């Protein structure tokens, strides 16, 4: 009994430290990718094209690395892979201190940082307790979201004092995360030293076995990120508000999401599979309606209220969807499978802004991008609604 309590204590301690490490790494990413690179053209001679390439290539590096990182963790071990990850992240941001406006350094650092954060995410997802998946995934996504937002906002404030003088803070945050890593014990589900050819075959096998999940993984990311390029235009040109009021809408959405992830996500653990299906289906339907509603609204107060509801729904939909994905994963292939899932999600997030921007550019209307995003969620609601009904009927008859 005492041994069991000690194991639970150590497990919880490891999980909390890993959450802090994830928060710090996403904090550094938010500072560099979402703030520093985005703001640099406004205060220096660096071209917008350079920073845009750096941001895009960061997510490409992240998605590509996710595809193979689970297999590398099994083959090389967590200590080597994570140490190299922290080293790459620290080195990439340390270079920015000395060459803050060098196009080559900015792009190279973005690539290295994209590679470096990948193993943290995969290990975090694979180490979640199955009995408390909804609650713990709420904490994981909260740490991720909080890290990105606080990092971005913090760097935005610091940037106003001096664009490059405080660049050292980014590498300092990574260094703190690196030090914390030595206080946590990371275990994999199963160490694997099979030949590379067999592991590549396993990637194909994992991909084939989880095809039913890929539309949801790919299209959710694409649908949400399709709105990113057009939201500022929608706020200033359609709703007719200032950048500050637009930022408040994002903050309200973030608050709603945080409340949901911290308090509502644990509901998923207390109910059965059918409840999870209803949350996912209902989430997709509500997202369809709320995104479509944005194309009709020109009152900022209503937009703020809608932002809170969107955040609340996202905060419970994400853990429910994660629990649904986890139910398809073999217990000894968690790192590999989560890596593939993250990679597919990353590619969806890359496609979204491109599609959203092109739709607005060619149709000359931001509303058409809202229609596209809403239709994608409607498709997901119908697709998975039919799937859930079939699975539920099969369960009843068996």
UniProtKB/Swiss-Prot annotation:
It is a multi-pass membrane protein. GO terms for cellular component: plasma membrane. InterPro entries: MFS, MFS_dom, MFS_Efflux_Transporters, MFS_trans_sf. Coiled coil: none annotated. Pathway: Cell wall biogenesis; lipoteichoic acid biosynthesis. Keywords: Antiport, Cell membrane, Lipid transport, Membrane, Transmembrane, Transmembrane helix, Transport, Virulence. GO terms for biological process: lipid transport; lipoteichoic acid biosynthetic process. It comes from the Bacteria. GO terms for molecular function: antiporter activity. Belongs to the major facilitator superfamily. LtaA family. This is Proton-coupled antiporter flippase LtaA. It comes from Staphylococcus saprophyticus subsp. saprophyticus (strain ATCC 15305 / DSM 20229 / NCIMB 8711 / NCTC 7292 / S-41).
């Amino acid at each position: 009994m005492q041994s069991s309590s000690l194991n639970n204590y150590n497990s919880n301690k490891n999980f909390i430290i890993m959450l802090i490490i994830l928060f710090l790494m996403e904090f550094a990413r938010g500072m560099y990718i979402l703030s520093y690179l985005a703001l640099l053209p406004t205060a220096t001679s660096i071209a917008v094209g350079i920073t845009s390439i750096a941001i895009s290539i960061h997510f490409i590096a992240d998605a590509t690395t996710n595809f193979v990182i689970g297999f590398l963790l099994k083959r090389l071990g967590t200590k080597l892979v994570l140490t190299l990850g922290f080293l790459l992240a620290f080195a990439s941001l340390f270079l920015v201190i000395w060459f803050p406006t060098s196009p080559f350094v900015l792009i190279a650092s973005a690539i290295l940082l994209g590679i470096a954060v990948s193993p943290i995410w995969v290990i975090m997802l694979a180490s979640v307790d199955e009995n408390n998946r909804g609650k713990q995934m709420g904490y994981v996504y909260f740490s991720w979201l909080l890290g990105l937002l606080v990092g971005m906002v913090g760097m935005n404030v610091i940037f106003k004092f001096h664009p490059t003088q405080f660049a050292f803070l980014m590498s300092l945050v990574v260094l703190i995360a690196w030090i914390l890593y030595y206080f946590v014990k990371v275990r994999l589900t199963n160490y694997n030293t099979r030949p590379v050819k067999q592991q590549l075959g396993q990637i194909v096998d994992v991909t084939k076995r989880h095809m039913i999940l890929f539309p949801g993984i790919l299209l959710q990311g694409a649908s949400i990120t399709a709105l990113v390029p057009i939201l500022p235009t929608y706020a200033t040109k359609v709703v007719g508000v200032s950048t500050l009021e637009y930022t408040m809408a994002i903050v309200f959405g973030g608050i709603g999401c945080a409340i949901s992830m911290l308090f509502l996500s644990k509901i998923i653990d207390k109910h059965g599979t059918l409840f999870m299906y209803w949350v996912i289906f209902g989430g997709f339907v509500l997202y369809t309606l709320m995104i479509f509603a944005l194309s009709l609204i020109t009152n900022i107060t209503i937009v703020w209220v809608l932002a809170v509801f969107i955040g609340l729904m996202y905060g419970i939909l994400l853990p429910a969807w994660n629990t649904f994905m986890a139910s398809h994963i073999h217990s000894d292939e968690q790192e590999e499978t989560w890596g593939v899932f993250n990679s597919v999600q990353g590619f969806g997030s890359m496609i979204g802004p491109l599609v959203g921007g092109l739709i607005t550019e060619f149709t000359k209307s931001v509303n058409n991008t809202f229609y596209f995003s809403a239709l994608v969620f409607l498709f997901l609601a119908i697709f998975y609604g039919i799937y859930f009904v079939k699975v539920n009927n099969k369960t009843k008859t068996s």
